[in-house]
């Protein structure tokens, strides 16, 4: 959500984009003091959020490649201490998605997102892959 516009969860996506931009800028500002700041961009993580999302009529119902929190944290800590990356992305599917949305026009990215959500809604697909 931080790397692409996401219709129907607009505020969520905008907030994620802000946090990514803020973290990258703060990381640069804090560098002379030896302080690192890194944004976590894990994709979907199995948390209490899912219990609430499944109980609403929210249009966003398709949770692709849900990660376990402990795995996301392990990747984040590894990236924080062993790389100079300004952000951490857990899992190959999400890393590939981040790369792809940087190359495609936002209009196409949003169409794909909307079609994915419509497909999930039509199939009552509330499960994860």
Task: Label each residue range with its predicted role.
Residues 12, 20:
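Catalytic tyrosine of NAD(P)H-dependent dehydrogenase/reductases that use a Tyr as the general acid/base
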Residues 1-4:
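Active-site segment of SDR-like NAD(P)-dependent oxidoreductases
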Residues 24:
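A short, exposed helix-loop element centered on a Lys and neighboring polar residues
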Residues 6-10:
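Active-site loop immediately N-terminal to the catalytic Tyr-X3-Lys motif
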Residues 15:
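Active-site helix of classical SDR
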Residues 63-65, 71-129:
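C-terminal tail/cap regions
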Residues 27-92:
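SDR active-site lid
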């Amino acid at each position: 959500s931080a790397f692409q516009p996401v219709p129907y969860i607009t505020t969520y996506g905008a907030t994620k984009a802000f946090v990514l931009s803020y973290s990258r800028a703060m990381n640069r500002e804090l560098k002379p003091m030896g302080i690192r700041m890194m944004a976590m961009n894990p994709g979907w993580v199995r948390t209490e959020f899912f219990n609430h999302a499944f109980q609403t009529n929210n249009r966003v119902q398709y949770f692709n490649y849900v990660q376990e929190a402990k795995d996301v944290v392990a990747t984040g800590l590894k990236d924080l201490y062993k790389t100079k990356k300004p952000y951490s992305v857990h899992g190959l599917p999400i890393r590939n998605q981040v790369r792809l949305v940087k190359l495609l026009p936002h209009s196409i990215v949003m169409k794909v997102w909307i079609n994915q959500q419509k497909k999930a809604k039509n199939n009552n697909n509330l499960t994860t892959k």
